[in-house]
């Protein structure tokens, strides 16, 4: 811990506490206990638990953006494969506690304007690389063209979050496998004959 700034250490440990207990089930004392720092240290860095939650979301999405960069934005890989690589990478990191973005969306968006504003910002940024990837797939004929890229991108994220929620409830990954089957075998594939395209 000596090499880790207290603020960042609190965020890292707080993320785990929120994933395990939820926002409402986590007290500041739980977070400081997990981080093994005095409670006063928390308020030296964060104005409130709500502000801390917003910061945790920012950090969580920053980590997610690294996965986005290495998968969805990898131009050396065909668009559909990029999408598959993204979901495969996320599945590797899931441990049954779900996605913090989805968890906070369900639990806090009706209660906290601070968190809701941060969630809106995150979803706005999150959808863009999906849209870009889908557009490229439509241009090459590997993804259906009869649905708008923004509609498909929004649906992918929304249905993925729903699959993660089901995974938490059922305590197995079958909902994730069902999502992948429907998306990549039924929803996205183009029915066009690519060889006849000019």
UniProtKB/Swiss-Prot annotation:
Where is each HTH tetR-type domain found? Answer: 4-64
Database matches in Pfam families = TetR_C_13, TetR_N
Record keywords: DNA-binding, Repressor, Transcription, Transcription regulation
Keyword Repressor assigned? yes
Q: What's a Gene Ontology MF term here? A: DNA binding
The record ties this protein, via PROSITE patterns, to: HTH_TETR_2 (PS50977)
InterPro entries linked: Homeodomain-like_sf, HTH_TetR, Tet_transcr_reg_TetR-rel_C_sf, TetR_C
Recorded hits in PANTHER family, A to Z, give: HTH-TYPE TRANSCRIPTIONAL REPRESSOR NEMR, TRANSCRIPTIONAL REGULATORY PROTEIN
Q: Tell me, in a sentence or two, what this protein's role is.
A: Transcriptional repressor for the dhaA haloalkane dehalogenase gene.
Q: What is this protein called?
A: HTH-type transcriptional repressor DhaR
What is the organism field in this record? Mycobacterium sp. (strain GP1)
Its ancestry begins with: Bacteria, Bacillati, Actinomycetota, Actinomycetes, Mycobacteriales
Q: Which gene encodes it?
A: dhaR
């Amino acid at each position: 811990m000596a090499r880790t700034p207290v603020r960042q250490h609190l965020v890292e440990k707080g993320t785990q506490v929120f994933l395990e207990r939820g926002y409402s089930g986590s007290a500041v004392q739980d977070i400081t206990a997990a981080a093994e720092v005095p409670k006063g240290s928390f308020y030296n860095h964060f104005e409130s638990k709500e502000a801390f939650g917003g910061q945790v979301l920012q950090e969580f999405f920053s980590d997610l953006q690294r996965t986005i960069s290495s998968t969805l934005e990898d131009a050396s890989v065909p668009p559909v494969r990029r999408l598959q690589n993204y979901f495969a990478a996320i599945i590797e990191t899931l441990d049954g506690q779900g996605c913090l973005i989805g968890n906070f969306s369900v639990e806090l968006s009706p209660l906290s304007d601070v968190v809701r504003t941060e969630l809106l910002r995150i979803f706005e940024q999150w959808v863009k690389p999906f849209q870009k990837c889908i557009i490229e797939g439509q241009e090459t004929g590997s993804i259906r063209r009869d649905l708008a890229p923004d509609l498909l991108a929004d649906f992918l994220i929304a249905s993925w979050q729903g699959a993660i929620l089901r995974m938490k409830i059922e305590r197995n990954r079958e909902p994730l496998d069902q999502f992948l089957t429907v998306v990549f075998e039924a929803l996205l594939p183009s029915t066009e004959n690519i060889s006849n395209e000019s």
